[in-house]
Amino acid sequence: MSDHEVKMVVLSTENLDESIKFYETLGFSLKFRDGAHFAALDGGAVTLALATPVDHPIPGKVVVGIKTADVDAAAKEIEATGGAIIKGPYDDAHERRAVVYDNTGNGLVFYSPLKR
């Protein structure tokens, strides 16, 4: 079994309220909202996240969020296998993150909750 688990898909939006309303009409309920720039919707096993450019890892792109125990090691692994680190690894308010491109340019964000 992999140490990495796909847990989130991040979509870009310029208007968080309109996007939340759109996805709620499809039956996705709001799990979490951070101001006017980020929302997490219940997509079952995978969270559907909506983010404005303020909080989006790669604005304008679809990004897959992968939960992992070791963000730093995952980022190094990406670099070693032909991908590229875009940002990080770094700590934000809630988690450790690394924003990367895979070997074909797809956006990924590896993350792990910070231990408090």
Curated annotation (Swiss-Prot):
Domain of life: Bacteria
Span of domain VOC: 5-113
Keyword Ubl conjugation applies: yes
PROSITE patterns per UniProt: VOC (PS51819)
Pfam families registered for this protein in UniProt: Glyoxalase (PF00903)
InterPro entries: Glyas_Bleomycin-R_OHBP_Dase, Glyas_Fos-R_dOase_dom, VOC
Isoglutamyl lysine isopeptide (Lys-Gln) (interchain with Q-Cter in protein Pup) crosslink location in chain: K76
Signal peptide start and end residues: none
Key words of the record: Isopeptide bond, Ubl conjugation
Record's protein name: Uncharacterized protein MSMEG_6630
